[in-house]
Amino acid sequence: MLKTPLCDLLGIEKPVFQGGMAWIADASLASAVSEAGGLGIIAAMNADANWLRDQIHELRAKTDKPFGVNVMLMSPFADEVAQVVIDERVPVVVTGAGNPAKYMKAWNEAGIKVIPVVASVALARLVARRGATAVVAEGAESGGHIGETSTMALVPQVVDAVDIPVVAAGGIADGRGVAAAFMLGAEGVQMGTRFLVADECTVSEQYKEMVLKANDTSTRATGRSTGHPVRALKSPFTNAYAKSEGSGASAEELGAMGTGALRKAAKDGNYEEGSFLCGQIAGMVNERQSAREIVDDLVDGAEHVLKGACAWVA
């Protein structure tokens, strides 16, 4: 049985987080992952308080297991969403796209476990000082908004820099990746891309088919000129965006291009105009499975690898 101290800290059975993917990580997927023993996460994205409250209620109708909410700090509704997670007694809050320091005192006082996603040692240290329960160290292999440091390089540096549990994210798709993360000092993993093709994931069929057909070179990162790089599957949209970026388009022009592109991919399956966020491990995702099958495969695979590695030690 694969269990780390982080499992006891959060009350979960398996050290697997499902990434809080905007327009994708809803009550359907999150409840299934939590029921499977991992930590399912609802993405609050740019939604308002009422939408999030409805999603929390829907999830609780499906499971009584621990779950989390991903709060995107750049959202215009961040303040009201930050209050909803308190009012609804959400067990875990995962934050992204910014520094959560302004909310952490209130969340901690409410008994919420706060786990920021970080892409640097500096931010990891800052949130640890402010009372974070753990951090997700997310490497540049991830889909969506990314930093510049790989998971292999980032995770051990964050582990050495803070005295709280570290969850590894980016480039993890099977038990080998989970085992590698543990060897780097992580106590858990967060994964998004493989869950895109879970049976309970409500993303568009076009999106799922693109992930299943992807290989090791199917993603590209754009938006570095804006300071907010994003990794997605190559598509007409990413080609057009990269062309505009290379031609010197302003941050405002690029922002206008990107507005609504993820929704067009996730909900409409719009190949021409959608941004299909996806990690570099998409080439390893080649079958549809239930969330439970995915979680079990990760854990069973990691156990097999970790036990086998001991045979190399004389």
Placement of each model-derived feature along the sequence:
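Residue-level detector of alpha-helix initiation sites
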Residues: 24, 172-173
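Conserved active-site-proximal phosphate/metal-binding subdomains
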Residues: 151-167, 173-314
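Active-site entrance/lid segments in N-terminal catalytic domains of soluble metabolic enzymes
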Residues: 1-165
